[in-house]
């Protein structure tokens, strides 16, 4: 039923798992004996973070934040709001911010600056998708599974109006669906 709204599938579930496994192996090497704190940006990061954690073979703690700059639409409002902050004290910690997609970069720049202010030891960004064409602020991810074109994608945590997150793959949403 949801598939009728998808223009094309970009990445299958198996494609995503393969890339995520490779990233997990890299994080294992980079954070051996460091006990990093992975902070997932809800809601979109949940499938990616859950898959990623399965492939990290070192100690890691997790926490979550709810941050929004979209407020239900298809384009960023430009205003970043923290709706739920982390519960963990991050001072002196090695932080890995886990995000489903980097588009404008505003949210991640805001979080990185906030964690610097809170005296995190290191701050790295891991994302499933990076959309450099959408960037309006200067920020780069440290770990990227896929660079993608400037298309509206959904699935594997990515949504349109809180729908399509449950698709096991990532596809391009038909324009007529979000331009109504």
UniProtKB/Swiss-Prot annotation:
The keyword Nucleotide-binding applies. Diphosphate binds at residues 43-44, 165. SUPFAM superfamilies: PRTase-like. InterPro entries: HGPRT, Hxn_phspho_trans, PRibTrfase_dom, PRTase-like. GO terms for biological process: GMP salvage; guanine salvage; hypoxanthine metabolic process; IMP salvage; purine ribonucleoside salvage. Keywords: Cytoplasm, Glycosyltransferase, Magnesium, Metal-binding, Nucleotide-binding, Purine salvage, Transferase. It catalyses: IMP + diphosphate = hypoxanthine + 5-phospho-alpha-D-ribose 1-diphosphate; GMP + diphosphate = guanine + 5-phospho-alpha-D-ribose 1-diphosphate. It is found in: Cytoplasm. The keyword Ligase does not apply. PANTHER family: HYPOXANTHINE PHOSPHORIBOSYLTRANSFERASE, HYPOXANTHINE-GUANINE PHOSPHORIBOSYLTRANSFERASE. This is Hypoxanthine-guanine phosphoribosyltransferase. It comes from Streptococcus pyogenes serotype M6 (strain ATCC BAA-946 / MGAS10394).
């Amino acid at each position: 039923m949801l598939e009728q709204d998808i223009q094309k599938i970009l990445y299958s579930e198996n494609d995503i798992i393969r890339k995520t496994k490779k990233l997990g192996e890299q994080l294992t090497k980079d954070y051996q004996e460091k006990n990093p704190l992975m902070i997932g940006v809800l809601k979109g990061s949940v499938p990616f973070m859950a898959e990623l954690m399965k492939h990290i073979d070192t100690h890691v703690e997790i926490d979550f934040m709810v941050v929004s700059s979209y407020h239900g639409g298809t384009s960023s409002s430009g205003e970043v709001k923290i709706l739920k902050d982390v519960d963990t004290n991050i001072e002196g910690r090695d932080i890995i911010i886990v995000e489903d997609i980097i588009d404008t970069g505003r949210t991640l720049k805001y979080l990185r600056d906030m964690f610097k202010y809170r005296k995190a030891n290191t701050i790295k960004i891991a994302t499933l998708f990076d959309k450099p064409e959408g960037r309006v602020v200067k920020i780069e991810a440290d770990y990227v599974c896929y660079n993608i074109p400037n298309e509206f994608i959904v699935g594997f945590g990515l949504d349109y109006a809180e729908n399509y997150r449950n698709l096991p793959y990532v596809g391009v949403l038909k324009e007529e669906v979000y331009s109504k």
